UniProtKB/Swiss-Prot annotation:
Name of protein: Elongation factor Tu
Record has Plastid as a keyword: no
Residue span(s) of domain tr-type G: 10-201
InterPro entries (alphabetical): EF-Tu_GTP-bd, EF-Tu_GTPase, EFTu-like_2, EFTU_2, G_TR_CS, P-loop_NTPase, Small_GTP-bd, T_Tr_GTP-bd_dom
Species of origin: Jannaschia sp. (strain CCS1)
């Protein structure tokens, strides 16, 4: 099955397995690689190495495989805390997820939590694998569990009635027995993933955005801002907006430079300098973004989903309370903000993950799904994602 050479001709999609502990996420991951990739056994996936993302230690296993139609990068995490951190930091961005539910147990607390997190952090699509069906003798019971899963998904605003639910046994597939619930179920699952989870728009095809990292003035030519283009394309002559921190202004890009060479355009992934017409050195600063006019607005108030580091991870040693005022680091800059805790929450302990409201002292170019770090005096004490913009 293994391909000699990685062909970049197929569209690429990032997915992962989510769900309650011991429901079979890692076994399923192994079974998929057995049929569609270079086989990785359970042990090698389960002993995932630790990585650091935004100062947070996360264990994540990365595997890749391909179907007729697509190439997939797939993440699987050994522990529940790793999932929470992964989803919140966006360390492994997912275009869709395979929710694994044990048919004998039905949805459990972490099943719920992962669906809620998926909704908050913007995982747009889910496909369900109902695992361990050989442990349930009663056909009606399977139907009830499926209904329960669909209702749970609907309650978190996923289209529960439309989401594919594939019954099977990942272990049977891995051990090469009972093809009807084993191997065939994995084929059905990947066919559903192929069809139901759309290929995301490539970064280049999205509206232009570049966080400003530095500002220079070049005598006789004007002001140059530098940064890495996050998405889209900028052409010489394009009208662009400068958004965040101050009032939004418009300007025209009169030149694009990369490695000291003049180009006609810069695109997603490029580190460029953009020459701005009629903007003086004081008129623009790090922390603002250049973007396609009207594509992103500045905001100060939002609902966040956040993970607070433990003291072992270098975070706080003590809890924080209402009106906590740390810095929120968005893209390239820190902005002070006040935390408004949800009703009934008195304090937040290191190691907690929760939802709260934030009000910043200056507006930031913001959209749902934007990641940030929570810092105190330059030290990271948490990570979060904009779940919903309020104003």
């Amino acid at each position: 099955m293994a391909k000699e050479k990685f062909e970049r001709s197929k569209p690429h999609v990032n997915i992962g397995t989510i769900g309650h502990v011991d429901h079979g996420k890692t076994t399923l991951t192994a079974a998929i690689t057995k049929q569609f990739g270079d086989f990785q056994d359970y042990a090698s996936i389960d002993s995932a190495p630790e990585e650091r993302a935004r100062g947070i230690t996360i264990s994540t296993a990365h595997v890749e495989y391909e179907t007729e139609n697509r190439h997939y990068a797939h993440v699987d995490c050994p522990g529940h805390a790793d999932y929470v951190k992964n989803m919140i930091t966006g360390a492994a961005q997912m275009d869709g997820a395979i929710l694994v539910v044990n048919a004998a147990d039905g949805p459990m607390p972490q099943t719920r939590e992962h669906i809620l997190l998926g909704r908050q952090v913007g995982i747009p699509y889910m496909v369900v694998y109902m695992n361990k069906v050989d442990q349930v003798d009663d056909e009606e019971l399977l139907e009830l569990v499926e209904m329960e899963i669909r209702e749970l998904l609907s309650s978190y605003e996923y289209p529960g009635d439309d989401i594919p639910v594939i019954p099977g046994s990942a272990l049977a597939a891995l051990e090469g027995r009972d093809d009807a619930i084993g191997k065939d179920s994995i084929d059905k699952l990947m066919a559903a993933v192929d069809e139901y989870i759309p290929t995301p728009a490539r970064a280049v095809d999205q509206p232009f955005l570049m966080p400003i990292e530095d500002v220079f003035s070049i005598s006789g030519r004007g002001t140059v801002v530098t940064g890495r283009v996050e998405r889209g394309v900028i052409n010489v002559g394009d009208e662009i907006s400068i958004v965040g921190i101050r009032d939004t202004t418009k300007t025209t890009c009169t030149g694009v430079e990369m490695f000291r060479k003049l180009l006609d355009r810069g695109e997603a992934g490029d580190n460029i300098g953009a020459l701005l017409r009629g903007v003086d050195r004081e008129g623009v600063e790090r922390g603002q973004v250049l973007c396609k006019p009207g594509s992103v607005d500045p905001h100060t108030k939002f609902e966040a989903e956040a993970y607070i580091l433990t003291k072992e991870e270098g975070g706080r040693h003590t809890p924080f309370f209402a009106n906590y005022r740390p810095q929120f680091y968005f893209r390239t800059t820190d902005v002070t903000g006040t935390v408004n805790l949800p009703a009934g929450t008195e304090m937040v302990m290191p190691g907690d993950n929760l939802k709260f409201e934030v009000e910043l002292i200056a507006p930031i170019a913001m959209e749902d799904g934007l990641r940030f770090a929570i810092r105190e005096g330059g030290r990271t004490v948490g990570a979060g994602v904009v779940a919903k913009i309020i104003e």
